[in-house]
Amino acid sequence: MVKQIESKTAFQEALDAAGDKLVVVDFSATWCGPCKMIKPFFHSLSEKYSNVIFLEVDVDDCQDVASECEVKCMPTFQFFKKGQKVGEFSGANKEKLEATINELV
């Protein structure tokens, strides 16, 4: 299941609640074509990797979160463990997304 993040507070709470689990964050926008293309795949990964937390941040709804995380383009995927960023890449690359999850989990 993918949790939609609505605020900076909710983002911080989700990172804190994850504990030792890997957190994958999809920074996207409704108007972004590549974001729409990879969204179903991102959701399918959340079903496949039940031990990983999947979050979705709409950069237009949560500009403060996107800015704090220094997101420059969409989609950007960031990976967190124990509240610290441990990985990041931009672009709708399905293979890289799953490979990065496998590497960090």
Swiss-Prot record:
The alphabetical list of record keywords is: Acetylation, Activator, Allergen, Cytoplasm, Disulfide bond, Electron transport, Nucleus, Redox-active center, S-nitrosylation, Secreted, Transcription, Transcription regulation, Transport, Ubl conjugation
PTM annotation: In the fully reduced protein, both Cys-69 and Cys-73 are nitrosylated in response to nitric oxide (NO). When two disulfide bonds are present in the protein, only Cys-73 is nitrosylated. Cys-73 can serve as donor for nitrosylation of target proteins. In case of infection, ubiquitinated by S.typhimurium protein slrP, leading to its degradation.
What happens upon changing residue 73 to S? Answer: Loss of nitrosylation, and loss of S-nitrosylating activity towards CASP3. Retains interaction with APEX1 and transcription activation
Return the Pfam families for the record.
Thioredoxin
Q: Which GO terms describe its biological process?
A: cell redox homeostasis; cellular detoxification of hydrogen peroxide; negative regulation of protein export from nucleus; negative regulation of transcription by RNA polymerase II; positive regulation of DNA binding; positive regulation of peptidyl-cysteine S-nitrosylation; positive regulation of phosphatidylinositol 3-kinase/protein kinase B signal transduction; response to nitric oxide
Tell me a GO cellular component.
cytoplasm
User: Mind telling me which InterPro entries this protein's record contains?
Assistant: Thioredoxin, Thioredoxin-like_sf, Thioredoxin_CS, Thioredoxin_domain
Please identify the protein, giving its name as recorded: Thioredoxin
Q: Where in the cell is it found?
A: Nucleus; Cytoplasm; Secreted
In this chain, where does the modification S-nitrosocysteine occur? 62, 69, 73
Q: What is its main location?
A: nucleus
Asked whether the keyword Nucleus is assigned, the reply is yes
What triggers its expression?
A: Up-regulated by ionizing radiation.
Stated consequence of mutating residue 35 to S: Loses its reducing activity, interaction with APEX1 and transcription activation
Q: Which domain of life is it from?
A: Eukaryota
The UniProt-reported impact of residue 70 to A is:
Strongly reduced interaction with CASP3
> Which species is the source of this protein?
Homo sapiens
Q: Which Gene3D superfamilies match?
A: Glutaredoxin
Site feature location: Contributes to redox potential value: 33-34
What residues make up the catalytic site?
32, 35
Q: Where is the Thioredoxin domain?
A: 2-105
Keyword hit for Phosphoprotein = no
Query: What does the annotation give as the result of altering residue 69 to S?
Result: No effect on reducing activity, interaction with APEX1 and on S-nitrosylation of C-73. Retains interaction with APEX1 and transcription activation
Subunit structure, interactors included:
Homodimer; disulfide-linked. Interacts with TXNIP through the redox-active site. Interacts with MAP3K5 and CASP3. In case of infection, interacts with S.typhimurium protein slrP. Interacts with APEX1; the interaction stimulates the FOS/JUN AP-1 DNA-binding activity in a redox-dependent manner.
Q: Where N6-succinyllysine occurs, residue numbers?
A: 8, 94
GO MF term list: protein homodimerization activity; protein-disulfide reductase [NAD(P)H] activity; protein-disulfide reductase activity; RNA binding; thioredoxin-disulfide reductase (NADPH) activity
